[in-house]
Structure formats: structure tokens, C-alpha cells
Amino acid sequence: MHEMAICMGIIQIVEEKVRERSSSRVRSVCLELGTLSHAAPEAIRFCFAVAAMRTVAEGAALNIVELPGVAWCMSCSKSVEIARRGDCCPCCGSYQLQVTAGEQMRVKALEID
């Protein structure tokens, strides 16, 4: 389950930002998660709750903003939304797609006391 390693990294980022601001607690974390990132949102939620135990993030809400997968079709020269790798172009049916967005994962915002 690589989601636990991801959440441990998120907690490290959160703790670093809390130290920088001399704060003591995190109320919420906003995470942008691309649909092509290979991370399951529900697994991320579960692992975040476990990873946050006994840290400044314990009890913090995790808000996940899911970002769509986007690819450039080399056949019809259009930017198209895709649900997963291996999908065909919804415009022309070609499989010659280059992923341009949807693989990202980042901490977008923190609400800190």
C-alpha cells in the first residue's frame, strides 16, 4: 500500500509548515490528487488518519480535490479528458495520446491554528 508512504510525506510537509509558522495545530489539509496518480482517494483518507496520529495533524480534516486526467491527441491535435491510461481519444478514437495532466499530487492548502 503506497498510500501510507504518500501520507507520511504529507505529514512531513505539514509538520514543516507548522514549524515555520510557530503554530501548534492543523485544522485541515487540502490535497490535489490527479485521477492518473495511481493513488486511491479512500485509501489516502484512511492512511492520512493513521499517519496523523500523535502529530500536529491529528484530527485534521483531509479535503481531496480530484483533478481529471488530460491528454494531447497526436492524431486530431486536441486536448482531451481521459479516465485512465490506455483510454482512446474520445474525439477520434486514436490511442496516440500523451498525458499532460492528472498525474499530480500536491498539498494545495493548510488551515493552521
Swiss-Prot record:
An example molecular function term from Gene Ontology annotations: zinc ion binding
Single GO biological process annotation from the record: protein maturation
Residues that, per the record, bind Ni(2+): 2
Pfam families for the chain: HypA
Residues noted as binding Zn(2+) in the record, renumbered to the chain: 73, 76, 89, 92
Key words, A-Z: Metal-binding, Nickel, Zinc
Function: Involved in the maturation of [NiFe] hydrogenases. Required for nickel insertion into the metal center of the hydrogenase.
Family statement drawn from the similarity comment of this UniProt entry: Belongs to the HypA/HybF family.
Protein name according to UniProt: Hydrogenase maturation factor HypA 1
Lineage: Bacteria, Pseudomonadati, Pseudomonadota, Alphaproteobacteria, Hyphomicrobiales
